């Protein structure tokens, strides 16, 4: 590989690529734009978007077997909106909504329903 495209960061350990982060840009020294990181095997580990150095928008994390582990939305670096967590075999383990980092509304955890303070109206439908 003689050229590396702008915005692509490679991290090498003992000559092998173990993490590749694809960043669309840095804005004033902060991560800004979509990113992906990978396990040493090359399997996708996580993907999402940064805005002004913080997670913002949909973010997904994966197990080493490629199965989705967790997905949820962020706003200004805080969990904000619907989140779901899965087992290594793909079964839904938990599900709920965050309001700027705080659980709200009904959550399903290990098959049980847990109720927190109500979500604001703009989050009631999972937005």
Regions found by a protein language model. Name each.
Residues 2-127:
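Glycine/tyrosine- and acidic-biased, solvent-exposed loop/turn segments at the edges of beta-strands
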């Amino acid at each position: 590989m003689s050229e590396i495209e702008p915005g692509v960061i490679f991290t090498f350990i003992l000559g092998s690529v173990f993490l590749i982060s694809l960043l669309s840009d840095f804005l004033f020294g902060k991560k800004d734009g979509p990113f992906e990181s990978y396990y040493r095997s090359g399997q996708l580990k996580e993907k999402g978007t940064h805005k002004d150095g913080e997670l913002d928008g949909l973010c997904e994390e994966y197990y080493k077997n490629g199965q989705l582990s967790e997905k949820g939305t962020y706003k200004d670096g805080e969990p904000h909106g619907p989140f779901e967590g899965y087992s290594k075999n793909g079964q839904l383990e938990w599900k709920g909504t965050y309001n700027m980092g705080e659980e709200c509304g009904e959550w399903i955890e290990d098959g049980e329903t847990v109720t927190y303070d109500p979500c604001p109206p703009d989050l009631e439908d999972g937005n």
